[in-house]
């Protein structure tokens, strides 16, 4: 099993130590049975020391068994911690394009459901290991008592285990399907939570989402979980009843066939009773391990970036003068839409506005410009030199951005991840009219319950605090009131230029196009620059041009 192989590779010596403890626990368990057989059944030892010896063995068995199980459980939790941390780091290192293809619902399912299933498996793993080791050790002890009886008992037990595995295989099959259904349910949950306002307004749509999206997926989940539980419980009960049958078989072989005396039969029965709980626990634990393997395979199918422990420090381009996109093209995976070839040269300190209709490719161009999407052909050049695709972090370090689907972080960070310049923060808090709204504590924003427009202002503050050369603003002013929108174009953008910022703003505010150094337009994935009469016409009626 690939999951256990990975544990072995990463924690070889701790794993060996845990196995040694498990072997010691099994040996003590068998030794206790031998002690009962030799000192309490066969010879009926009347010495007063027999009880303290027996109690001492019990306490030692308890301590070693508990120690081995705790050690294995702790090892499992260390592995899960490492697995989750590596998964998060791989998400952070994976191209945005790939993350968008996967979708947040499936990734959240991986971080919650899949990792939880792996955790449960490692909690139950001690039961599986203990059951296997005790079974092997007990078989060796029973062989010494009666080889013929062990052979028949082993055949009986083999049938028991085979039947259990057949049933468990069906559990595995349904668990694999169940995991796919969970992804659908997470998408349904996201629809209900993210679309709560629209669904509250439109009860017919809410009914459709509930009856046509959620209910079929929930019913499919219910079907497979019931089937999985049915086969799991069948496996446990099959094993339970067959173990009791083995005890009857032992006494039949001893008394009817005369293969052993009553003391040996009693020892056999005692050993089987001792094995009953660990063996049944092992059978019960096996589905969790199989489910964990399904979850582990699901995590691997995400095809995220390889794990790298370090966060490479990007190298800055402090004195760049021109940024050029030369014959850059990009097409989405389904080939439903493409942009390019794009040819664009940006000079340091320029203020550029990009206009275009919905679906014209504005946001895609923004993703290409910032290095979040990789061009499928063409190249990006800084001062005439191609930007290496092997180190996109160096290029991305030029940019701060405020996207339309803004996410607010509560920590203000400056260059190189250090605390933000307090004078800069104070200045822009005042400029953004947020000084009375935001509560800061040690560079952390305490209150983030803000309106959408206010969140955009905080996002701009976060971007400016990073003190990077180029700032991308994707329809930033769309959520501002008319007064502050005018303030943004007439006051804030010139202030940013005075700071040396190069500004690339996606905008539909035709009244303010006059403030741009250059006006660009995206139309059906093609970029053009508007000059002269075209620019004047766009300024008079941007809506008509971008419809």
Swiss-Prot record:
InterPro entries: AAA+_ATPase, ABC1_TM_dom, ABC1_TM_sf, ABC_transporter-like_ATP-bd, ABC_transporter-like_CS, Cyc_pep_transpt_SyrD/YojI, P-loop_NTPase, Type_1_exporter. GO terms for cellular component: ATP-binding cassette (ABC) transporter complex; membrane. It is found in: Cell inner membrane. Residues 323-547 form the ABC transporter domain. PROSITE patterns: ABC_TM1F, ABC_TRANSPORTER_1, ABC_TRANSPORTER_2. Disruption phenotype: Disruption increases sensitivity of cells to microcin J25. The chain crosses the membrane at residues 16-36, 47-67, 125-145, 149-169, 240-260, 270-290. SMART domains: AAA. The keyword Transmembrane helix applies. ATP binds at residues 356-363. GO terms for biological process: microcin transport; peptide transport; response to antibiotic. One of its GO terms (molecular function) is ATP binding. Disulfide bonds: none annotated. Residues 15-291 form the ABC transmembrane type-1 domain. Its main location: membrane. Keywords: Antibiotic resistance, ATP-binding, Cell inner membrane, Cell membrane, Membrane, Nucleotide-binding, Transmembrane, Transmembrane helix, Transport. It is a multi-pass membrane protein. PANTHER family: ATP-BINDING CASSETTE SUB-FAMILY B (PTHR24221), ATP-BINDING CASSETTE SUB-FAMILY B MEMBER 6 (PTHR24221:SF654). Belongs to the ABC transporter superfamily. Mediates resistance to the antibacterial peptide microcin J25, when expressed from a multicopy vector. Functions as an efflux pump for microcin J25, with the help of the outer membrane channel TolC. This is ABC transporter ATP-binding/permease protein YojI. The gene is yojI.
């Amino acid at each position: 099993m690939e999951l256990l192989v990975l544990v072995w590779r990463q924690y070889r010596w701790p794993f060996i130590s845990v196995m040694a403890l498990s072997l010691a626990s099994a040996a003590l368990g068998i030794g206790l049975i031998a002690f009962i057989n030799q000192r309490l059944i066969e010879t009926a030892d009347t010495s007063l020391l027999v009880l303290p010896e027996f109690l001492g063995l019990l306490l030692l068995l308890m301590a070693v068994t508990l120690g081995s199980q705790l050690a294995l459980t702790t090892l499992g939790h260390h592995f899960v911690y490492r697995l989750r941390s590596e998964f998060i780091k791989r998400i952070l290192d994976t191209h945005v394009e790939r993350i968008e293809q996967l979708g947040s619902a499936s990734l959240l399912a991986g971080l919650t459901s899949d990792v939880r299933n792996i955790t449960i498996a490692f909690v139950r793993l001690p039961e599986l290991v203990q059951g296997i080791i005790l079974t092997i050790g007990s078989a060796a002890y029973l062989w010494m008592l009666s080889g013929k009886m062990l052979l028949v008992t082993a055949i009986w037990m083999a049938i028991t285990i085979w039947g259990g595995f057949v049933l468990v295989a069906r559990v595995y099959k349904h668990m694999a399907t169940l995991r796919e259904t969970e992804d659908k349910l997470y998408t349904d949950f996201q629809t209900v939570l993210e679309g709560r306002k629209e669904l509250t307004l439109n009860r017919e749509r809410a009914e459709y989402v509930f009856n046509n999206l959620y209910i079929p997926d929930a019913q499919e989940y219910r079907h497979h979980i019931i089937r999985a539980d049915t086969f799991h419980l069948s496996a446990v009960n099959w094993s339970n009843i067959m173990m009791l049958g083995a005890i009857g078989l032992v006494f039949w072989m001893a008394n009817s066939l005369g293969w052993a005396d009553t003391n040996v039969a009693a020892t056999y029965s005692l050993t089987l009773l001792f094995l009953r709980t660990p063996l049944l626990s092992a059978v019960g634990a096996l589905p969790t391990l199989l489910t964990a393997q399904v979850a582990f395979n699901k995590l691997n199918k995400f095809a995220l970036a390889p794990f790298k422990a370090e966060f490479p420090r990007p190298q800055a381009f402090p004195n760049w003068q021109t940024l050029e996109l030369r014959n850059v093209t990009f097409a989405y995976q389904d080939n439903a839409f493409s942009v390019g070839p794009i040819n664009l040269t940006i000079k340091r300190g320029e203020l550029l506005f990009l206009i275009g209709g919905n679906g014209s490719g504005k946001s895609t161009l923004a993703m290409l410009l910032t290095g979040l999407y990789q061009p499928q052909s063409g190249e990006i050049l800084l001062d005439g030199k191609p930007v290496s695709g092997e180190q996109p972090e160096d290029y991305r370090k030029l940019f701060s951005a405020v996207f339309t689907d803004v996410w607010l972080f509560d920590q203000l960070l400056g260059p190189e991840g250090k605390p933000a310049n307090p004078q800069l923060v104070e200045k822009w808090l005042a400029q953004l009219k947020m000084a009375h709204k935001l509560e800061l504590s040690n560079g952390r924003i305490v209150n983030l319950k803000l309106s959408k427009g206010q969140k955009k202002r905080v996002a701009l503050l976060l971007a400016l605090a990073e003190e990077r050369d180029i700032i991308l603003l994707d329809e930033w002013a769309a959520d501002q009131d008319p007064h502050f929108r005018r303030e943004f174009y007439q006051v804030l953008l010139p202030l940013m230029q005075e700071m040396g910022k190069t500004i690339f703003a996606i905008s539909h505010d035709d009244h303010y196009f006059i403030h741009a150094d250059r006006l660009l337009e995206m139309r059906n994935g093609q970029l053009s620059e508007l000059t002269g009469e075209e620019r004047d016409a766009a300024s008079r009626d941007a809506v008509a041009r971008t419809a």
